[in-house]
Amino acid sequence: SLDPVTIHADLSEWIIKVTGETNAIISEFDRPSGSGMSSETLLFESTWGEAENEVHKKLVARLAPTDQDIPVFPNYNLSSQVKVMKLVEQLTDIKVPKVLWEEASIDVLGVPFFVMEQVQGRVPPDIPPYVFGGWLFDATPESQLRLQELCVGIIAQLHQIKQKSPDTDFLEFHTKGDTALVRHFANQKEYYRWVVQGGRQHPVIEQAFDWLESHWPEES
């Protein structure tokens, strides 16, 4: 919903400011299709510095949604995304894009945003959902299994992060519950209630909630 010409001009000026290089330039934007639908994602390249000190990077700008965009979450917290990515980079060897800059104000582009380095790879699409079609749907069973195992491995690494400090307090859900699992479950139910507040129900999801509550693990 943002004007790409205006964004390019404003981001060009901002890059000069954050790099401290008056010759910093950025390329035209490439907008990924089929994924990243919760907010605007812009792919571009930037160059700054001179001669042997020249820096060239492939970058991604992630913009918070505007007030005119259809909300996907009750509250869109861009800062939490940045904090999570930085924690994962610091505490694991998971390949996560390095966040270079964060702009919390709306003075530059009209919405908060951050800029990170690109990580090369293939992203399963949201449109259509990858379970209905696309490169992952068409992949061989062996390739699908490999992606599944890699995803489970990444999730396992994330759960091995034991560090508890004021830097991780933002990860706690504010829902009631004696354990992290109970609070997570309560948070998901709250999100579901927000999604269906217009009157559209999802019986399968509600049945799943009921099943989980009646089969709750003794250790959670």
Which role does the model predict for each range below?
Residues 1-27:
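Juxta-kinase regulatory segment immediately upstream of eukaryotic protein kinase catalytic domains
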Residues 28-207, 211, 215-218:
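ATP-binding pocket architecture of kinase catalytic cores
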